[in-house]
């Protein structure tokens, strides 16, 4: 399971190129563009790396990198806030984290907010008025069951309407679900076919999530964290597990840094000639303690 420590962004030695509206992910017959985040062993975002620091493979075959850039581009972002009963003791910290995210947003960013408990609820469509988002959740309480999969499914579809090519879904939740109509399989399929990166933040203290028995809470926590981690890994996002309010706020700031310090790697697929419905992408980065986060693959047109 990918558990990332909280830290600040590492300074760039290389100069960034001017901001450009690059696609978050694109795969066609000519070029595949893959967004990549790099973190060090402390969890700090690393920028300023050169093209030759990266190795990319598709279905195990090394690919020649044809284009390479590092851009700070605007983001169309969806936020899903879990307001179910299992988040009751973490709700105050979750609201603080949401505020930290909003305050870290760039002027060109846009975001919508969906909440979830027994059913998904749309709190705000795409807006640049982030104060409106904060106002809508200021007096909300946590209660009820959790239709998390439904909320994520609906939010991924809503993200398609975002004006910016770069798209991300931020999920503040413990990962538990007990009231959804969609299945986890349906959500995974939609996630890998979308062009959005999913970033998740989950409280790591079982006692803060469930008052009805520590053993059951630990078991459900483990399943929820695995579910969130898989969604993040498949889409090139990062899953954060936090244990107190301070770490939660830092996680949101780290996600903001990740969104604004991405590399985009482009390549023309060269494989062994097999016709594959699913093509696996693997990105590695040179450097002690560095790790690259990229989506797990794509389905060719």
Where in this protein do the model-derived segments appear?
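Sec-dependent N-terminal signal peptides
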Residues: 1-2
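Scaffold/interface architecture of coatomer-like assemblies
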Residues: 5-301
């Amino acid at each position: 399971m990918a558990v990332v420590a909280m830290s600040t962004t590492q300074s760039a030695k290389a100069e960034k190129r001017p901001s450009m509206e690059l696609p978050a992910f694109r795969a066609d017959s000519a070029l595949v563009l893959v967004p990549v985040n790099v973190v060090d062993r402390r969890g700090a975002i690393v920028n300023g790396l050169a093209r030759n620091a990266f190795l990319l493979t598709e279905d195990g075959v090394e690919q020649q990198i044809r284009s390479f850039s590092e851009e700070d581009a605007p983001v169309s972002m969806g936020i899903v806030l879990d307001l179910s009963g299992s988040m009751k003791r973490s709700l105050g910290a979750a609201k603080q984290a949401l505020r930290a995210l909003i305050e870290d947003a760039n002027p060109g960013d846009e975001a919508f907010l969906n909440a979830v408990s027994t059913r998904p609820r749309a709190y705000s469509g795409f807006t640049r008025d982030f104060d409106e988002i904060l106002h809508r959740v200021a007096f909300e309480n946590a209660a009820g069951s959790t239709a998390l999969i439904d909320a994520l499914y609906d939010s991924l579809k809503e993200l398609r309407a975002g004006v910016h090519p770069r798209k991300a879904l931020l999920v503040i939740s413990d990962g538990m679900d007990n009231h959804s109509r969609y299945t986890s399989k349906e959500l995974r399929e939609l996630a890998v076919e979308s062009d959005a990166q999913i970033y998740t933040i989950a409280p790591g203290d079982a006692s803060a999530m469930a008052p009805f028995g520590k053993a059951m809470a630990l078991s459900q926590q483990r399943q929820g964290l695995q579910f969130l981690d898989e969604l993040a890994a498949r889409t090139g996002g990062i899953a954060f597990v936090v244990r107190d309010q301070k770490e939660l706020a830092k996680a949101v700031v780290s996600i903001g840094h990740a969104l604004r310090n991405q590399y985009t790697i482009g390549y023309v697929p060269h494989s062994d000639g097999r016709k594959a419905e699913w093509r696996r992408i693997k990105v590695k980065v040179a450097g002690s303690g560095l790790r690259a986060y990229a989506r797990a693959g794509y389905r060719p047109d």
